[in-house]
Amino acid sequence: MDNCILEIRNLSHYYDNNGNKTLDNINLKIKKNEFITLLGPSGCGKTTLIKILGGFLSQKNGEIYFFSKEISKTSPNKREINTVFQNYALFPHMNVFDNISFGLRMKKTPKDIIKEKVKTSLSLIGMPKYAYRNINELSGGQKQRVAIARAMVMEPKLLLLDEPLSALDLKMRQEMQKELKKIQRQLGITFIYVTHDQEEALTMSDRIVVMNEGIILQVGTPEEIYNEPKTKFVADFIGESNIFDGTYKKELVVSLLGYEFECLDKGFEAEEAVDLVIRPEDIKLLPKGKGHLSGIITSAIFQGVHYEMTLEIQKTNWIVQSTRLTKVGEEVDIFLEPDDIHVMHKE
């Protein structure tokens, strides 16, 4: 991979003596200036991986190369890697300036340089007039910005962010997502971001690493992860999905509920049992007799940007999302284009 700054090779970790691995043979390459997100449910190993990369925890097996140098034995303060924690970890007895400048002062940086660097950092996070504000006077979003500024002022080559927005309300979280992406682009620093929130991952990332039970399931761009999931877990975890049992009849043709649909996926055997993934927003509803399969609407909920409806077809439930309401009890047909159906091997 061109411009690779971090390479993780065959990394494993376990907390107990029974060999139950929290990380199982992790291999990953990360590029310079990349915004990469570790995404997965609680307990999947993403925070453990961040702690190992930051030097706060030692892996049981494997190697970590940072700019081609193995750093497993390197102490955290020597790694040129900084971490922003979920709880901010700010000093409540210090003001904003002193919090941000703490690391620089520990390195005995000249005062004039400290002042200039803190000023630049405050401007970058949109808080130029808050230098001497008490930490306890700040909102949650402002505290998070200060924590990020404190990490960035040290000019790390890699910034680790462990669910930094989880304590914020929805509106503030969405605003901070945009700010983080903007800051990352301006600084040109590689970010590794940890979250269980699929929206955060899809909004900010250049690439997403989907994890579960200590294993990397898929790595790709947000579009690749959403549109081309490789496993049933990924399809179900990223966005809403309809996942059905189907049969790959022949090249570019699948069978579902007795109807043969055209598809775009190749690499399957004739008559192979497969999983079919159909996103709710890709299903078109037509008058009965005008589409592929017929069903009846059994529920409809308004969700702001669209209606989410449940459609029963041959005793299977389909989730459908549309800006147009189809009333409960109405009989309709579905229509699917070839690119609306994603075919996956059975696990």
Swiss-Prot record:
Which PROSITE patterns does the record cross-reference, listed alphabetically?
ABC_TRANSPORTER_1, ABC_TRANSPORTER_2, POTA
Under Gene Ontology molecular function, one entry of this record is: ATP binding
Q: Does the keyword ATP-binding apply?
A: yes
Q: Which SMART domains match?
A: AAA (SM00382)
Positions that bind ATP: G40, P41, S42, G43, C44, G45, K46, T47
The protein's enzyme class? translocase
Where is the protein situated, by its record's location annotation?
Cell inner membrane
Domain ABC transporter, residue spans: 6-238
Q: Which reaction does it catalyse?
A: ATP + H2O + polyamine-[polyamine-binding protein]Side 1 = ADP + phosphate + polyamineSide 2 + [polyamine-binding protein]Side 1
Alphabetically list the UniProt keywords: ATP-binding, Cell inner membrane, Cell membrane, Membrane, Nucleotide-binding, Translocase, Transport
Q: Which GO terms describe its cellular component?
A: ATP-binding cassette (ABC) transporter complex
EC id = 7.6.2.11
How does the protein's chain sit in the membrane according to the entry?
Peripheral membrane protein
Gene3D superfamilies xrefs: 2.40.50.100, P-loop containing nucleotide triphosphate hydrolases (3.40.50.300)
- Protein origin, superkingdom: Bacteria
What quaternary structure, including any partners, is listed in this protein's UniProt entry?
The complex is composed of two ATP-binding proteins (PotA), two transmembrane proteins (PotB and PotC) and a solute-binding protein (PotD).
Described function: Part of the ABC transporter complex PotABCD involved in spermidine/putrescine import. Responsible for energy coupling to the transport system.
Matching PANTHER family: SPERMIDINE/PUTRESCINE IMPORT ATP-BINDING PROTEIN POTA, SPERMIDINE_PUTRESCINE IMPORT ATP-BINDING PROTEIN POTA
Q: Give the family this protein belongs to, as stated in its UniProt record.
A: Belongs to the ABC transporter superfamily. Spermidine/putrescine importer (TC 3.A.1.11.1) family.
Q: What is this protein called?
A: Spermidine/putrescine import ATP-binding protein PotA
Q: Which gene is transcribed and translated to give this protein?
A: potA
